[in-house]
Amino acid sequence: MNLRRRGIVVSFHSNMVTVEDEETGERILCKLRGKFRLQNLKIYVGDRVEYTPDETGSGVIENVLHRKNLLTKPHVANVDQVILVVTVKMPETSTYIIDKFLVLAEKNELETVMVINKMDLYDEDDLRKVRELEEIYSGLYPIVKTSAKTGMGIEELKEYLKGKISTMAGLSGVGKSSLLNAINPGLKLRVSEVSEKLQRGRHTTTTAQLLKFDFGGYVVDTPGFANLEINDIEPEELKHYFKEFGDKQCFFSDCNHVDEPECGVKEAVENGEIAESRYENYVKMFYELLGRRKK
């Protein structure tokens, strides 16, 4: 008799794993079969697994099913999309940080929804910065403007979240936890105030966990990241993660769009088809990666 069931990993507790049964929705505390340690097999939040329940109400994870993807920073499996939360103050998210997040999402073949949060706090100068972000990114990614305090944009954001596994991304202090509380009050996530002096929130989550929305779908709430590493990307690979570069015609088929002549990307920047900030951030990342490789 096959007692194995299937579920999804929603959280970790020391050496135990919480699995949500895919049929019943029941959450089972499971330990790992010995082969995971012996074969150094890894398991992550978002993994779909086979487990065997026991008579005590706990279970044992037998196998990890095929992963469609795996994010490494943070470690999350089978993600459908990234919800990138940015703010123009307290803290300000630079376009360079935004573009690093987007490069990582593109590398992992993930859809991205950009959320400009804390709209209730912005004065006219801040709103000008919001419009600048919209000008740069609206043709590339969906943008939702939100306020957890007033409810602005919350229903629109819910539509993007329904039925999918999403991961929140963004600097600490941009209001990821507050947004999730506004989207689904039952989540009851802790919220930290942003220090005005540091303009950087204290992390309110310490390990990744999968949270289930009442309206369907999951989200992984993970710590905000001040530093984003793209070290495993080759300099020549980087251009593929700036989606607006793809259809530009260059004289050289292997053009890196930096110092080559007759470059379609540089021409597109000059005539306004590609945002200057996007290109400048690309060049900065390219040389960072090139310098790291030479060390």
UniProtKB/Swiss-Prot annotation:
One term under GO cellular component: cytoplasm
Cofactor note: Binds 1 zinc ion per subunit.
InterPro entries: G_CP_dom, NA-bd_OB-fold, P-loop_NTPase, Ribosome_biogen_GTPase_RsgA, RsgA_GTPase_dom, RsgA_N
Compartmental location: Cytoplasm
Annotated Pfam families: RsgA_GTPase, RsgA_N
One example of a Gene Ontology biological process annotation: ribosomal small subunit biogenesis
GO molecular function: GTP binding; GTPase activity; metal ion binding; rRNA binding
Domain annotation CP-type G: ranges: 68-228
Binding-site residues, Zn(2+): 250, 255, 257, 263
EC number: 3.6.1.-
UniProt entry tagged with the keyword Hydrolase: yes
Keyword terms: Cytoplasm, GTP-binding, Hydrolase, Metal-binding, Nucleotide-binding, Ribosome biogenesis, RNA-binding, rRNA-binding, Zinc
CDD domains reported in the protein's UniProt record: S1_YloQ_GTPase (cd04466), YjeQ_EngC (cd01854)
Binding site for GTP: 117-120, 170-178
Family: Belongs to the TRAFAC class YlqF/YawG GTPase family. RsgA subfamily.
Quaternary structure and partners: Monomer. Associates with 30S ribosomal subunit, binds 16S rRNA.
Name assigned to this protein: Small ribosomal subunit biogenesis GTPase RsgA
Gene: rsgA
